[in-house]
Design a protein with these regions (language model features):
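Glycine-rich phosphate-binding loop used to anchor ATP phosphates in small-molecule kinases
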Residues: 69-176
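ATP-binding Walker
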Residues: 13
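NTP-dependent small-molecule kinase module
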Residues: 203-207, 213-258
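Walker A/P-loop
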Residues: 16
Length: 258
């Protein structure tokens, strides 16, 4: 069975770059690797620009948009009674208007207009994770996820539900419970100066300068992350990437794995 690696940390610490480099190095050593970075719409356990629809709503969409029926089915995640429809591939829409807007109105977690209740959000997440991890084969050595365990779920819970630390911890524990005895490790990238790291990341990405409110959000996110790691009872490593220490971080993770 594959070993599962969760690469975590607040925004701007270099998670996606490290996932790409780690994937390349492991493949170079002969390992079979599947990995997903942020905004990869093929990620089986993460959701960005994904609509949640009931069975009745899904049937209605299929009926009203017969020309898009094949595409709808292609980009739908089915789990229990749940239908999740991915409608963007990064900046590229997967559907035309007006169907695209209808799906956007049903966004599941990324700045949703009408968030589902927190209990339903957790149930949907767990159902998708349980289905995916219960059907893993033997053909892959490593599965590497960029921010799928802590980064995106905790962002959702803080921004959309104003969840407290105990609620966040409960959700993450339940997600990890869907993995059963599957071997996994959390590698958490940390930096001594969150504000400075965010500023560098925004400059590199040609984004607007960070605001004081944004810095405060990520400091609170970091505190929530540390609370979860302290109490979640999982195998994790804190990896220091202060002072551009990504090369050392990569070598440390590789040494830990192989």
């Amino acid at each position: 069975m594959p070993k599962i690696l969760f690469i975590e940390g607040v925004s701007g610490v270099g998670k996606s770059t490290l996932v790409r480099r780690l994937t390349e190095r492991l493949r170079g050593q002969g390992y079979s690797v599947k990995s997903w970075v942020e905004f990869d719409f093929t990620n089986p356990i993460d959701f960005y620009c994904t609509a949640v629809v009931s069975s009745e709503e899904y049937e209605d969409l299929c009926s009203r948009y017969p020309a898009s029926l094949e595409t709808l089915r292609q980009y739908t995640v089915f789990a229990d009674d749940i239908k999740l429809v991915r409608y963007y591939n990064e900046d590229t829409p997967l559907f035309e208007q007006p169907l695209l807007s209808e799906l956007w109105d049903r966004e599941f977690c990324y700045e949703p207009k009408n968030p589902v209740p927190l209990s339903e959000y957790a149930r949907i997440y767990q159902a998708v994770w349980r289905q995916y991890f219960s059907t893993l084969g033997q053909e892959t050595d490593y599965l590497i996820f960029d921010g799928s365990l802590l980064h995106h779920p905790i962002n959702d819970m803080m921004r959309n539900y104003h969840a407290d630390k105990e609620q966040i911890l409960c959700h993450i524990r339940q997600l990890l419970g869907t993995l059963g005895s599957q071997e996994r490790t959390i590698y958490y990238l940390r930096t001594d100066d969150i504000a400075a790291q965010l500023a560098r990341a925004h400059t590199d990405r040609r984004q607007n300068p960070t605001s004081a409110k944004e810095v405060e959000f990520w400091r609170q996110r970091y505190e929530n992350d540390q609370f979860v790691l302290q109490w979640v009872d999982e195998n994790f490593q804190i990896v220091d990437v202060s002072n551009k220490g990504w090369n050392n971080a990569l070598e440390m993770i590789l040494a830990d794995l192989v």
